[in-house]
């Protein structure tokens, strides 16, 4: 799993919220630092739940990060002597992130991306499916269902304690007050108000 490579490659860490994606990203990046590799970390500006200039896991572990508004900003940084590039919450970037990550790996960097594979509706969360496809290694983590305690692969969005509607906005940054992990059986997406039958 942790072989020495002579060229760049892409690692993808994915799963539902609270599955430990950021924790695993931080762990891998710290291993790189311990191995005396130069590590640079990026995160989207939209994710300011815990800290603007750090990737922070839900249990409080953190690593310094560069806050960027769009994927193309990665290429404005001097990455010449960088060995490992980490990118957290990658689902908040547009499809341009895929070609950027491929370019970085082609240039010899080990690129580690972390993000949600499904949105709150249980549908693929772009651009993660494309990143998973071009990655040499994909790690899919699971959380624990907040309802029954079984393995959880879905993210339940709650608005005022009730399941979000299918036509609610895809991106709504939150933490445990807005989301919880759920298994397939307990994941609920409420119908649109527009779908209610007229009486």
From Swiss-Prot:
Its EC number is 2.7.1.21. GO terms for biological process: DNA biosynthetic process; thymidine metabolic process. PROSITE patterns: TK_CELLULAR_TYPE. Gene3D superfamilies: 3.30.60.20, P-loop containing nucleotide triphosphate hydrolases (3.40.50.300). Its main location: cytoplasm. The active site is at residue 89. Zn(2+) binds at residues 145, 148, 183, 186. InterPro entries: P-loop_NTPase, Thymidine_kinase, Thymidine_kinase_CS. It is found in: Cytoplasm. It is an enzyme of class 2 (transferase). This is Thymidine kinase. It comes from Staphylococcus aureus (strain COL).
